[in-house]
UniProtKB/Swiss-Prot annotation:
Species: Aspergillus clavatus (strain ATCC 1007 / CBS 513.65 / DSM 816 / NCTC 3887 / NRRL 1 / QM 1276 / 107)
Residues glycosylated per entry: 43, 81, 117, 197
Keywords noted in UniProt: Disulfide bond, Glycoprotein, Glycosidase, Hydrolase, Lectin, Secreted, Signal
CDD domains documented for this protein: beta-trefoil_Ricin_AglA, GH27
Keyword Lyase attached: no
E.C. designation(s): 3.2.1.22
Record's protein name: Probable alpha-galactosidase A
Gene Ontology MF term list: alpha-galactosidase activity; carbohydrate binding
Function per UniProt: Hydrolyzes a variety of simple alpha-D-galactoside as well as more complex molecules such as oligosaccharides and polysaccharides.
Family: Belongs to the glycosyl hydrolase 27 family.
UniProt-listed Gene3D superfamilies: 2.80.10.50, Aldolase class I, Golgi alpha-mannosidase II
GO CC terms in record: extracellular region
Annotated S-S bridges: 40-72, 120-150, 422-434, 459-472
Source lineage: Eukaryota, Fungi, Dikarya, Ascomycota, Pezizomycotina
Stretches assigned to the Ricin B-type lectin domain: 402-525
Amino acid sequence: MHPSMTLLAILPPLVRASIGNPHLLPTPPMGFNNWARFMCNLNESLFLDTAAAMLDTGLHAAGYTRLNLDDCWMASHRAPNGSLPWDPTKFPHSLPWLSAQLRSLGFSLGIYQDAGNVTCGGYPGSYGFEELDAHTFAEWGVDYLKLDGCNVSPAGAVSLADEYRARYARWHSVLGAMPHPLVFSESAPAYFVDPQNATAWYGVMDWVPAYGELARHSTDILVYEGEGSAWQSIMVNYRYNTLLARYQRPGYFNDPDFLIADHPGLSLVEKRSHFALWASFGAPLIISADVPGLSKEVIAVLTNADLIRVDQDALGLQATLASRSEHLDVLTRSLDGGDRLVTILNRGDGGLAVKVPVGWMGLQRCAYQAKNLWDGEIQEIEEDIEVQLDSHATEVFRVSLPPDCPMVIPTGIVFNTASGNCLTDGEALAFEPCRGQDLQVWQVEESGILRPLSRTSHCLTAIGDNVVVKPCTGRPGQRWTYHITGNLQNQHTGACLTEGTGIDVCGFELDSQVFGLPSGVDIEA
């Protein structure tokens, strides 16, 4: 075996849903969680009032049916038999009673626990009580578990990453043995985020999809009374999510955290962008807000049927970056039935006039219809979509493909997830800051051939220790394989694309060798 293939061969199997059953959660969850808005100030009345408001405002009818408790719901100590009681002051009628009440209204109850011996809020954790807690929750009528990762300490020579994996694997095993497994939301990756080196983070991300249905992968979104910019918090989690598209598919979803729909630091434009981006990602839509107090304008955003349809699309793909420049992101993905999603975000502080060519969408010149998913307006396009974007605004289009138009080719930037630099065609192939140019947009064919949009007669080619762009001839070195690890491996040489050296022996989740590619590209173990 080629030395560069050895590390890839020992990686975890290709992403699969928890319990081996993608039907447990075929589409992202939608609902409510108290944490970002109320933190530990949760109680029975909050959840009943939230349920009533969701029924009255149309949120329930739109699909928001999960009401999830977060930390601090439990008593301060376990019972003598080891079981975990609820706080009787916060939940005087009991959690089984609350679960039954919510179920009678058409909702389901989710719950929070922690993989350590103590939760983040200082309450009893699940370590050593996994099976007892799982069956207790099921007896209460709970069908969704968010497992946090505070206070996890390895013993002896065990690494921290291995300890997390063992504890989440234990929960996976317990849930898998139950007649009706709970949906399993894993927070393990969030404890390995390191802006200086992502190797450990990706190492955890490689296994979480095998154990659960969704993962809280990075920093917590800003809470209601937190300090700092709510918009910047959204953008931080947005960025992390763009690095992880390769993991997502039906049955497993990347979770960039809650929709903070009533945060006082957000304008309505920013709230619209928050929702549109999460829907474009196919991310969980979990509202953390004072739902009875939401304005009609915000309710209209959260119940946008066209965007919810995108979020719940059966293909389960995540939108990826087709193009990026200093202030502008264009994301695309394919939808069930053949339509193409185009999402355009202005990250800058001023307005932008934007033209998005059909080539960036993975299309060729033809007659298409593009529906604006905010106002429903349909426009005929052949060459591009033109749009005016206010600061921090996001427009979303659903492009219908007539049967006589060419098929979609996955198209977008090939970017290093650590540096953010784009693979750039030119006299000398290089990684450069992304500038929103065809030189940095690549078509990725099913055969493994990559062509720059600037000259589609040429292909990314490995020659010896170098990687260049040469005329496409079918020569050895012009076919590549994209791995779940983010490695782009040449099928002829066995080496991996590497920022800084061009191509090199494949390592394990090295920052220089992990790349984001367009949505829809085939992914190998």
